[in-house]
């Protein structure tokens, strides 16, 4: 064979071998990167799953309050309507009585109220709170404006039902929150406010207030005779310090 041809063939073999070696090296590098990326993705996904499990566990293992603890009503009954009249000027005094706008009650009372709400929602209604926990100072303000023990508890007699977080002033509305006929407005100090509904001409209003009354009484509440909207838990709570 021609020596020049031999040299040329040898060069070609060397170049081909070099290209093959380079190709193999490139493939190994690509595979290595791919494996690292896959491992990183898997590790990140595992970390996210672990974090989610921790969050879920924290939520599901949240300690349930004791029955005598004050709680935010809407936390446990999200679909209830709240319009605290004494947090506005829209009440019989014409002045704001307290500053907070959320309803608070004892947890045991809220559990009962949740059952009432469930029962009413099945009938196309919803509860609406006008007043719940009422600070003692607020009771003093109300007495100064309207010192009539038939409608306002005298603070001189100590802590009363609203001050202990087991009493609620409440009405019912349509499920969408729209107003329906009731015997009177809130804090109406006429005969229309009491539970003798014989003087109420509106039959629908009487029917609605009886729906409220039956639902409340069936779930552990008693109504105050002089005010159709006033209900107290049958369980009485001791006075404790609480600031909304």
Language model features with spans:
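Segments that shape or occlude catalytic/ligand-binding pockets
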Residues: 135
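Sec-dependent N-terminal signal peptides of Gram-positive bacterial secreted proteins and lipoproteins
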Residues: 4-24
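Extracytoplasmic/secreted cell-surface and envelope-processing proteins
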Residues: 138-139
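Extracytoplasmic cell-surface/polysaccharide-interacting catalytic and binding patches
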Residues: 22-130, 145-244
